[in-house]
Design a protein with these regions (language model features):
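Short, charged helix-to-loop "capping" segments that act as catalytic/coupling loops
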Residues: 45, 143-146
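Rossmann-like adenosine-cofactor binding region
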Residues: 146-154
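Phosphate/diphosphate ligand-binding glycine-rich loop within oxidoreductases
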Residues: 2-105
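Short acidic/polar active-site loop segments enriched in Thr and Asp
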Residues: 48, 135-136
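Glycine-rich adenosine-cofactor-binding loop
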Residues: 8, 90-95, 102, 106-107, ...
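Short, hydrophobic beta-strand segments that form beta-sheet elements in well-ordered domains
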Residues: 6-7, 31, 136-142, 154
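Residues that mark the start of a beta-strand
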Residues: 1-3, 112-113
Length: 154
């Protein structure tokens, strides 16, 4: 049976085990790991695949033998797979999910302006996908030239 789970620091709010129990026949556990224990967990952890959440989406990268092109571009990993040789492969599924939603929305965004509200972790993924699909991307954040006080000019 595959051993899967969610890696993060504080996971008490997660519904992931219940969701995955409905999806398939594999073990899915929450792995709450302190930052100072991350290296030992990744190199010796008893898992086959993990979803990765804050604060480890960037921190796991040095432990990956290989990254998918999108994970490399974004500098963010939210899926880890332990290969048969024991090495870790890092990927970012958020980009695929967001691209799927955009493509299936029925709206062609190529050549159109897209406003991204916020510049946190998910923002980089959204920006990359929108740009890849041909949109002109503007990021609105709390500070900087394009911010919430002048949103109306967009």
């Amino acid at each position: 049976m595959m051993r899967c789970g969610l890696l993060g620091e504080k996971l008490g709010h997660s519904y992931s085990p219940a969701i995955h129990a409905e999806l398939a026949d594999y073990a899915y556990k929450l792995y709450e790991v302190a930052p100072d224990a991350l290296a030992a967990f990744l190199t010796g952890g008893d898992f086959d695949a993990l979803n990765v959440t804050i604060p480890y989406k960037k921190a796991v990268i040095p432990y990956c033998a290989e990254l998918s092109p999108i994970a490399q571009k974004l500098g963010s990993v939210n899926v880890l797979v332990r290969r048969p040789d024991g090495t870790l492969y890092g990927d970012n599924a958020d980009a695929f999910g967001f691209e799927y939603l955009v493509r299936h929305s029925g709206v062609d965004i190529s050549g159109k302006k897209a406003l991204v509200l916020g510049n946190g972790g998910a923002s980089a993924t959204v920006q990359a996908v929108l740009a890849q699909l041909g949109a002109r991307v503007t990021v609105i954040s709390r500070s900087g030239e394009d911010n919430y006080t002048n949103l109306g000019r967009h």
